[in-house]
Regions:
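Intrinsically disordered, low-complexity Pro/Gly/Ser/Thr-rich segments with frequent PxxP/GP/PP motifs
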Residues: 464-474
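Hydrophobic alpha-helical transmembrane segments in integral membrane proteins
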Residues: 400-423
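Short, solvent-exposed loop/turn segments enriched in Ser/Thr/Gly
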Residues: 431-436
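Membrane-embedded alpha-helical bundles of multi-pass integral membrane proteins
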Residues: 2-261, 309-310, 322, 326-396
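Cysteine-centered iron-sulfur cluster-binding motifs in ferredoxin-type domains/subunits
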Residues: 115-130, 222-237, 268-316
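Asparagine-centered strand-capping/turn motif at beta-strand->loop junctions
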Residues: 439-444
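Short acidic, flexible loop segments centered on an aromatic residue
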Residues: 445-461
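Membrane-embedded translocation segments of transport machinery
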Residues: 256-274
Length: 474
């Protein structure tokens, strides 16, 4: 729950981190997390990213793109029946799958670049799990209320009101899950046609099965499992942790200015006593969708969504302190600031860590309560360094190579194969007949006519034994 600090008018939350070594046993039932709604720059950024990503996913299959009478008019289509992939003006054939492979490699390198610069920004902002959990939380807050109201509802005995709220929430979740699964199949067939067939019961069984599976996974992962998918099921946190270095941005509690904590920091400081900026209000814990306390340091569960930054900045504004007690920072920047604050490294269980107790508040605010101007803050140097430049160079080289290959590719493919049995036939007049299978792929969107001829063999002629035409393109 929450209470008002009498000295600072800052709301203090009774919030304990769920995902911490002290509170999590090896075999233990899930402890439900009730994240509080956050407000601030990063929350607004997440709203924008969520709206854009969901909009792209749900709207894209319905966008039309005129390719002429001999090709589908859906802008983005994976045409499994005809072995084609359409993306606006680009048409990819099976033998050109290296374009798709190249795009996947570029996506991987782009993800490496993002991780090396801004940490787990993919997890915090654009990962489908994060986006759909955010969407489900919007529904949960709209139906059941914010954090305190949801906690009270969970603790209350079952009643008509509680049942109605739970039923409404899960019903809306299921509608979202069905819509998510339904839209997915529209990427593999003409969306309006398949939608009509689906609603009238005439769609293929695989369409209904796919929607059913995706509905179940969306509902379970987004509504029920939530943070457990990130913590236990997804391998990416472990991979990303190995890709971070001392110049990668991560969400960091700057204990060099936050320690020692006091819930009456403003009053105690006015009395001439030395305390840090953290008032131990637990606002950062209350808003965290992963149920961690960022003040305990870097943790596997942290998806760097930065909602704790928004919550803490709001508290700092109320206290009249500088923002940034929790901020995006690099390890190199953090180490330099801890050293400037007078902290020393000590050995704890074999780890060389900074001693918070050694922080000297006079070093943090040496003059008139202002932060020491020597403290480092994130600059362009954390983004522009050899590692990121190499990633950018490789990414650009791949992109340019794919573009050149795309615009220089042949729009005609001819395959000639000799019949194996018999190799040849001697006719009654002594002539020799050879059989060949000729496959002509017209890779343009309009029909074309082709002429076959034989060069270098005097008196040779060609007979057409049979022909197949597929959609004017082969």
């Amino acid at each position: 729950m929450s209470a008002m600090d009498d000295s600072s008018a800052v709301t203090t939350f009774t919030a304990e981190p769920v995902n911490s070594k002290e509170n999590r046993a090896l075999y233990e039932a899930r402890k439900k997390i009730h994240p509080k709604r956050a407000e601030g720059f990063y929350r607004s950024l997440k709203w924008v990213v969520m709206a854009v990503t969901l909009g792209i996913y749900y709207i894209t299959p319905w966008i039309r793109w005129d390719r002429g009478p001999h090709a589908p008019d859906q802008a983005v289509l994976v045409d499994l029946a005809n072995a084609r992939f359409y993306f606006f003006f680009v048409e990819i054939w099976p033998q050109e799958f290296f374009f798709v492979a190249g795009l996947l490699v570029m996506a991987g390198i782009g993800l490496f670049l993002v991780t090396s610069t801004v940490g787990r920004a993919w997890c915090g902002y654009t990962c489908p799990q994060t986006v759909w959990v955010d969407l489900f939380l919007v529904v949960e807050r709209a139906v059941e209320g914010d954090r305190n109201a949801r906690i009270r509802l969970d603790q209350a005995p079952m009643s008509a009101s509680k049942f109605a709220k739970r039923f409404a929430k899960h019903a809306i979740w299921l509608l979202i899950a069905v819509a998510t699964g339904g839209v997915w199949i529209f990427y593999f067939a003409d969306a309006p046609t398949l939608a009509h067939s689906f609603l009238t019961g005439n769609a293929p069984f695989v369409a209904y099965a796919t929607v059913g599976v995706l509905t179940a996974t969306t509902y379970v992962f987004g509504g029920l499992l939530r943070e457990q998918v990130c913590t236990y099921m997804c391998p990416w946190p472990r991979i990303q942790a190995a890709m971070l270095d001392e110049n990668s941005l991560t969400v960091t509690y700057n204990d060099w200015r936050g320690e020692p904590r006091s819930r009456h920091a403003k009053r105690v400081r006015a009395e001439g006593k030395h305390v840090g900026d953290c008032v131990d209000c637990n606002a950062c814990v209350a808003v965290c969708p992963m149920g961690i306390d960022i003040r305990q340091g870097q943790q596997l569960e942290c998806i760097t969504c930065a909602l704790c930054i928004d919550a803490c900045n709001g508290v700092m504004d109320k206290l009249g302190f500088e923002r940034g007690l929790i901020s995006y920072a690099t390890l190199a920047e953090y180490d330099a600031n801890m050293s400037l604050a007078g902290s020393k490294r000590i050995n704890v269980a074999g780890d060389n860590v900074w001693d918070r107790a050694a922080i000297e508040p006079d070093q943090v605010r040496p003059e008139h309560g202002k932060l020491n101007a020597g403290f480092k803050h994130t600059g362009l140097s954390s983004f522009i360094r050899p590692r990121t430049l190499i990633y950018i160079a490789i990414w650009c080289a791949l992109g340019i190579g794919l573009l050149v290959a795309l615009f220089m590719r042949d729009r005609l493919d001819v395959n000639v194969r000799h019949d194996r049995n018999p190799l040849y036939v001697v006719l009654s007049d002594g002539a020799i007949r050879n059989g060949y299978e000729v496959k002509i792929l017209n890779m343009k969107l309009e029909p074309r006519s082709f002429r076959l001829s034989v060069d270098g063999l005097k008196g040779a002629s060609i007979w057409l034994a049979g022909a197949q035409d597929t959609n004017g393109q082969s």
